[in-house]
Amino acid sequence: MEDFKYRNYYVLRVTGGQEINVALILEERIKTNNINEIFSVVVPPNIKGYVILEATGPHVVKLISSGIRHVKGVAHGLIQKEDVTKFVSKSVALPAVKEGDLVEVISGPFRGMQAQVVRVESTKNEVVLNILESSYPVQVTVPLEQVKPVKR
């Protein structure tokens, strides 16, 4: 197997909603034709209509993608590796809550209930809540994504 010095990222324009299908077809073609010039196929989760290929050159991308039904073409230019990692990495903006804050539970079995934050476990991305709307004190641990601060 050759060690290729240059690896660039190329973007395929595809029909929206068909990104996974195109990626699977590309993967199958790469395996069956034993193509060593394509190193990875990336489907960005938040961007519809595009598939990213890590390859040695645009000629390889055009060759492997020719004849696939939902491929519209190769976008002009290259994209940087930092942009690819930004598209792929999961970055969720977690609500900023601290001990003593009033929050509302937005999902799960306690959805819609008001609660007070007892403790924030930032390593686990969880909060321990005291549900205010129950007749007796109930403490529950929920993921941080399931609460939002109450605006007052």
UniProtKB/Swiss-Prot annotation:
GO molecular-function terms, A-Z: structural constituent of ribosome; translation elongation factor activity
GO BP annotations listed: regulation of DNA-templated transcription; transcription elongation-coupled chromatin remodeling
Residue stretches making up the KOW domain: 99-129
Keyword Transcription: yes
HAMAP family in the record: Spt5_arch
Subunit-structure text: Heterodimer composed of Spt4 and Spt5. Interacts with RNA polymerase (RNAP).
Protein name as catalogued: Transcription elongation factor Spt5
Originating species: Sulfolobus acidocaldarius (strain ATCC 33909 / DSM 639 / JCM 8929 / NBRC 15157 / NCIMB 11770)
